[in-house]
Design a protein with these regions (language model features):
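Conserved Rossmann-fold dehydrogenase catalytic segment
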Residues: 141-148, 175-186
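Short helix-loop capping/hinge motifs at secondary-structure junctions, enriched
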Residues: 162-166
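Generic secondary-structure signature for well-ordered alpha-helical cores
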Residues: 26-29, 46-49, 129, 160, ...
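Rossmann-like NAD(P)(H) cofactor-binding subdomain of soluble oxidoreductases
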Residues: 70-75, 79-152, 168-169
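NAD(P)+-binding Rossmann beta1-loop-alpha1 motif at the extreme N-terminus of oxidoreductases
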Residues: 1-57, 63-68, 74
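A short helix-to-beta-strand connector/capping loop
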Residues: 57-66, 130-134, 175-177
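Short, hinge-like loop/turn segments at secondary-structure boundaries
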Residues: 48-53, 123-124, 152-156
Length: 186
C-alpha cells in the first residue's frame, strides 16, 4: 500500500463510531460517515453533535461527509471502519453492494459475527474476499467517553501486515491519542 492520503469511511454512529470520527478528524482531510437514520444526520449537520452518543463532542463537519447511503460511503473510502455492535454487523454488511475485496477493512467491533460464529476478519475473508493483508483491528485500552473528553488515551491497531498497520496507526495519533501498531490481530 503506497497511498498515504487515504479516505476513511466509518460505518456506525454509536459511542465508538462517534469517537473514531472525532479522532480521525484531527489528522485527516476527508472522512465519510454512514449513519442509517436521516433524523440523526439532519441533527448532526445542523448542530455538529451526535444527539444520541457523546453529545458533548463537537464534530469538525468541514472534514466529515455524512450519508445514509452505505454504498456511497464505502465506494468513496479506501479504509472502511466497521463500528457497529456485532449483533447488527451482518445486517449492515448485507447492504453493501459495491465490491470491497480491495478495500482496507478495520474491525472496531467486539465478539464474533453471530450468524457465522467467526471472527470478523475470518468472516470478511470468507464472505467478501477481503485479503488478510488488508484487514486490521482496533481496540483500547480506552473508552469512547475518554476520547470525547480528550483524555490521554491509548489505542492498539493490529494487522498481520505490519507496514499497513503502521501507516494506518499514524492516521489515528493526535495530541490525546497514542497508538501502538501490532502484528497480533486476535
Amino acid at each position: 500500500m503506497k497511498k498515504t492520503k487515504l479516505k476513511f469511511g466509518v460505518i456506525g454512529s454509536g459511542s465508538w463510531g462517534t469517537a473514531l470520527i472525532k479522532i480521525l478528524s484531527e489528522n485527516n482531510d476527508e472522512i465519510n460517515w454512514y449513519i442509517r437514520n436521516k433524523d440523526n444526520i439532519d441533527f448532526i449537520t445542523k448542530n455538529s453533535h451526535n444527539p444520541n452518543y457523546l453529545s458533548s463532542v463537537e464534530l469538525k463537519l468541514k472534514k466529515i461527509k455524512i450519508s445514509e447511503n452505505i454504498n456511497d460511503v464505502v465506494g468513496n473510502s479506501d479504509v472502511i471502519i466497521i463500528a457497529v455492535p456485532s449483533e447488527y454487523v451482518n445486517k449492515e454488511m448485507k447492504k453493501i453492494e459495491v465490491d470491497i475485496s480491495d478495500k482496507i477493512i478495520m474491525c472496531a467491533l467486539k465478539g464474533l459475527v453471530p450468524e457465522t460464529n467467526l471472527l470478523f476478519g475470518e468472516h470478511m475473508q470468507k464472505h467478501y474476499n477481503v485479503s488478510i493483508d488488508n484487514f486490521l483491528v482496533i481496540g483500547g485500552p480506552c473508552h469512547a467517553e475518554e476520547v470525547a473528553l480528550e483524555k490521554l488515551s491509548y489505542l492498539t491497531i493490529g494487522s498481520s501486515n505490519l507496514s499497513l498497520c503502521k501507516l494506518i496507526s499514524a492516521k489515528f495519533k493526535c495530541k490525546y491519542i497514542n497508538v501502538k501498531a501490532s502484528d497480533d490481530v486476535i
